[in-house]
Structure formats: structure tokens, C-alpha cells
Swiss-Prot record:
This is Probable glutamate dehydrogenase 3. GO terms for cellular component: cytosol; mitochondrion. GO terms for biological process: amino acid metabolic process. Its EC number is 1.4.1.3. The active site is at K102.
């Protein structure tokens, strides 16, 4: 089952629990707008290269649409559509005044020079500039993009619309980025984990973690969890996977990964098969890389008691059912990894106000939002006698449905 089919399935299950009528259900499911553009750029050697870019704007009932732009060879319409829909429910779960969107370009950024990436980003922005905006659709970084990409988008957009720092989030600090944004998704994973463990009378200290992915989300989550006394026993990234039952020294691993562009060769742990990271003996598993990695092939072998979804859609529906029967508690992506979009909201607010918050305020507000979000999620679980995933979906969908109905759109 691909990401879009799985997301639609979860939507329909939640819709049934909420008792939505068919007209409203259809209104919520169909994207507001789907954009597909061709982007041709001159390469450094003088040849021309063409790429296809996408932007799916899913829903704006609760506010401007919000979502990342990813650069990856496998970017395709169904995946972008699914991720845009998930952003709609995620922003609603977080209770921030946004809808959902997602975008991407089918390219391998590792095969393009910095100047080629800049040209590609600027051409893509030229094609979509009149369809995004501060109060319309606010992009952010995602896989294969980062603050520099956002700086190029801001600069190109500003040529058409004047200086508009709030048109993108995840920017460099010198262009209006927010303090604390870089760590926000990983910090949100920490706060989400603390909220779940507290519900079960536990703390992070002494818990054994396996983390799949050591990019922005996984590395920050690992550092912050380690700082709280959590023991990181296994980590993987695109270069390999490592394990140390006594706990990995995360600060040393961060230094190694920065110097060697990955964790491969780290001498403070043993190398293991990257595919085994998800089934390592641990208390808490944090998938923080690609989607669809937990499936029926490996779900029965998972030993973790808790799964915190740092990635988008890491667990497919078949695995969900298997893990539920095993008693594994899954904290779903649309809550667990919402720290990034929440601090993006803080950045947007700061840009509109023209006033910068200090990092302590950013982190304090993020904890407030994540703690409240878990409380709201649990209340929906109790109301509908459902698991955490359906609790999150019913929470998000219900909030969007209410806004849609009040506007008079769903009738």
C-alpha cells in the first residue's frame, strides 16, 4: 500500500469514528490545488537539464497552507499528495492556524553543484511564486533542502513581491530565521516521548533507544534524549548502522558524522546491518528517516515497547495492525514530529511582528504546544475508544471539519 492509499485509509477510518457525512468527507479529502511545473536549467558544463516540480496545496480552511519542499529522485505526485494531506491534519493537531501543503522536485541534490541547485530553486520559485505567499502557502525545508534553499526562494520571491521574510520558514537566522528552528523537530520528538512515558509512569532516563536516521531529526533527537539520560544503543543513517549495548557516546558520534559525512567507521560502536536497526533490542524505537520502513515483513520482529514516529508515515497499515496486537504503543507522526512545523509557525509570527524571540522562549512555547497536543490527543482516544494514531487523526480531522463547516464549504 503506497503512502497516499495508507493516508486515505486512515482518513476514512477517522471520518467513520467522527460520523462525517459523505459531502464533507469528500471536501476534506480532495486537494485544493495540485501544481506540476517543468524546470529547465543550464548545468555548469553548458548542457540543459529538465526537472519536474510539484506543489500540492491540500487545505486552507484553518489558515495559510504549510509544508516542506523536498529534493529527492523519487518525488512523485502520490507521495506529495499524501504528505500534503498529513500536513493538514498535523497543523490541526498542533493547533496552529495553518492548512497543509507539500512540494518537491524530482532530482538528486548530491549530483548537482551548489550553483545548479540555486538555479533550479530559483526557476521553481519563478514558476510558483504567484501561488505561494505569506497568507496563502508558506514553504519550508524538507529532505534534500535546508536554510540555504529557503534563502534562495525568499530572494527570488521578493523580486516579484517585495521583501517578504514570512513567505518561507526554516531560513538562515540572518534572513529572519528563528532561534531553535534547527533543533525543533528533534526537540518535539523529545517532548512527545516525555509526554507518552509520563502517561505510563516512566521517564527517559535509563530507557534504551534505537534511532533510524541521523539527519536533522534523528541527530537532534539522539542528542537531546542522551542529555536527559536516555541510552542510545543503536543508530543508522545512509552510510551504515552501529550498535553499542552500553550506550553510544552521541557527542563523539556527532563529531564523527560531521567530519566523515556519516556514521560509518565510528569506533565507539560495532557495525551492524542497516536493515536490523528497526528490530534491535530496545525499549523505544525512533524511525526518523524515510516513510514505509515498518511493514509486515519486519513488524513481528520489532522488540521495542514504544515507537515514536520522527519520520513521516514510517509505519504502513498492515504493520500497524500487527504491532497493535503485540501491544506496542505507537506515537503517530502527525503528533510526534510536529515540533518542526510548530516552530516554523513561531518563525512566521516573528517575521510578521518584526520581533525576534530568544531561544529559551521558543523552546518553552514548543513544550507548551507539545504537552497540550498530547493531552488533546488522549482525550480523543478516550472519546472514541481508539488507539493513538486514530486519536491523532480524529483530533486533526475534526478541527479541520469544524473550520470547513463554519465557513460554509462542506455543505
Amino acid at each position: 500500500m503506497n503512502a497516499l492509499a495508507a493516508t486515505n485509509r486512515n482518513f476514512k477510518l477517522a471520518s467513520r469514528l467522527l460520523g462525517l457525512d459523505s459531502k464533507l468527507e469528500k471536501s476534506l479529502l480532495i486537494p485544493f490545488r495540485e501544481i506540476k511545473v517543468e524546470c529547465t536549467i543550464p548545468k555548469d558544463d553548458g548542457t540543459l537539464a529538465s526537472f519536474v516540480g510539484f506543489r500540492v496545496q491540500h487545505d486552507n480552511a484553518r489558515g495559510p497552507m504549510k509544508g516542506g519542499i523536498r529534493y529527492h529522485p523519487e518525488v512523485e505526485p502520490d507521495e506529495v499528495n499524501a504528505l500534503a494531506q498529513l500536513m493538514t491534519w498535523k497543523t490541526a493537531v498542533a493547533k496552529i492556524p495553518y492548512g497543509g501543503a507539500k512540494g518537491g522536485i524530482g532530482c538528486d541534490p548530491s549530483e548537482l553543484s551548489l550553483s545548479e541547485l540555486e538555479r533550479l530553486t530559483r526557476v521553481f520559485t519563478q514558476k510558483i511564486h504567484d501561488l505561494i505567499g505569506i497568507h496563502t502557502d508558506v514553504p519550508a525545508p524538507d529532505m534534500g533542502t535546508g536554510p540555504q534553499t529557503m534563502a534562495w526562494i525568499l530572494d527570488e520571491y521578493s523580486k516579484f513581491h517585495g521583501h517578504s521574510p514570512a513567505v518561507v520558514t526554516g531560513k538562515p537566522i540572518d534572513l529572519g530565521g528563528s532561534l531553535g528552528r534547527d533543533a525543533a523537530t528533534g526537540r518535539g520528538v523529545l517532548f512527545a516521548t516525555e509526554a507518552l512515558l509520563n502517561e505510563h509512569g516512566k521517564t527517559i532516563s535509563g530507557q534504551r533507544f534505537a534511532i533510524q536516521g541521523f539527519g536533522n531529526v534523528g541527530s537532534w533527537a539522539a542528542k537531546l534524549i542522551s542529555d536527559k539520560g536516555g541510552k542510545i544503543v543503536a543508530v543508522s543513517d545512509v552510510t551504515g548502522a552501529i550498535k553499542n549495548n552500553n550506550g553510544i557516546d552521541i557527542l563523539s558520534l556527532l563529531e564523527h558524522a560531521e567530519e566523515n559525512r556519516g556514521i560509518k567507521g565510528f569506533d565507539g560502536a560495532d557495525s551492524i546491518d542497516p536493515d536490523s536497526i528497526l528490530v534491535e533490542d530496545c525499549d523505544i524505537l525512533v524511525p526518523a528517516a524515510l516513510g514505509g520502513v515498518i511493514n509486515r515483513e519486519n513488524a513481528n520482529e520489532i522488540k521495542a515497547k514504544f515507537i515514536i514516529e520522527g519520520a513521516n508515515h514510517p509505519t504502513d497499515p498492515e504493520a500497524d495492525e500487527i504491532l497493535k496486537k503485540k501491544g506496542v504503543m505507537i506515537l503517530p507522526d502527525i503528533y510526534a514530529n510536529s515540533g518542526g512545523v510548530t516552530v516554523s509557525y513561531f518563525e512566521w509570527v516573528q517575521n510578521i511582528q518584526g520581533f525576534m524571540w530568544d531561544e529559551e522562549k521558543v523552546n518553552r512555547e514548543l513544550k507548551t504546544y507539545m504537552t497540550r497536543g498530547f493531552k488533546d490527543l488522549k482525550e480523543m482516544c478516550q472519546t472514541h475508544s481508539c488507539d493513538l494514531r486514530m486519536g491523532a487523526f480524529t483530533l486533526g480531522i475534526n478541527r479541520v471539519a469544524q473550520a470547513t463547516t463554519i465557513r460554509g464549504w462542506g455543505s
